[in-house]
Amino acid sequence: MKKLPVHERFFTWQGEGVHLGRSAYFIRTFGCPVKCPWCDSAGTWHPDHTPKDVEKAEVDELVSAVVQSNCDFVVITGGEPTIHDLSHLTSALHQEKVPVHIETCGAFPFRGNFDWVTLSPKWWKLPLEENLSKASEFKIIVEDKSSIEKWVAEIPFAKFGVPVWLHPEWSSISPTANPEHKNGVLSSISQWVKKNGSPYRAGYQLHKLYDVDRLDPNSRSLVPLGGDPSRGY
C-alpha cells in the first residue's frame, strides 16, 4: 500500500488566494529542501524542530478522512509536497470526485494531477520554467519594500494571465516587527496594486487571524523561524 510522510492533516478553510473562505482539508507533507529562513512550518524540515513521530500515512486512509470531512476540496502542501510522488493520492481523490489543490514553490517536477496550483516562488530554489505555465495563481512573499520589483524582474508573471497575490511575509508584520519595516512592506503592496492593477492583488493569511487551523486537534502548532511563536507565526 502506498504511503506518504505526513506532518499533519486537518479540516479547516482556505485562508488565502482565490479560494479564500472555502472549506478545505489540508494534507501537509513532510520534508523540504528549500529551507526559507522565515518558514512558518519549519517542523516539516528543520533539524531543530522536526517531530520524532513522522506519520507514514496510507493513501486510502488519507482519502477516507478527506471524504468524511465533506470539504469543498483538498489542499496538498508542505514543506514542499512535490518532492513526493503524489500520483497515487491525486488519482484516489479524483476517483472520489474531490478537487485537488497544491501549494508549491514550483522547483520540482509535478507527479500527480492537480485541479488548482498555487505557485509561490522562492529565491532559495527558483521554479522550473515548465511549471510556471501550470500555475492557477501565483503568491509572492513580500519580505521588504523591494521584494515585488525583484520578483517581477525575475519572472514575467503578467504573461500567464492568472492572479498574482502579494503577501506580506508574516513575521514582518507581527506585533514585534519593526514598525518602519512593517509599514514599508504593507505600503509597497498597496502602492504596487494601485499603480499596476491586474493581475496583481493584495493578499493576506486570514486563517492566522481566525486561528482556525487549531480548531482541529489533528493540526500541529506552527513552528516558525521568524515572528512571534506564541501567536503561531
Model regions: which residues?
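Conserved AdoMet/S-adenosylmethionine-binding subsite of the radical SAM
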Residues: 63, 82-233
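Flexible, acidic/Gly-rich N-terminal and inter-domain linker regions that tether
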Residues: 1-30, 34-38, 42-43, 201-203, ...
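Conserved Radical SAM active-site core
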Residues: 4-11, 23-24, 30, 35-115
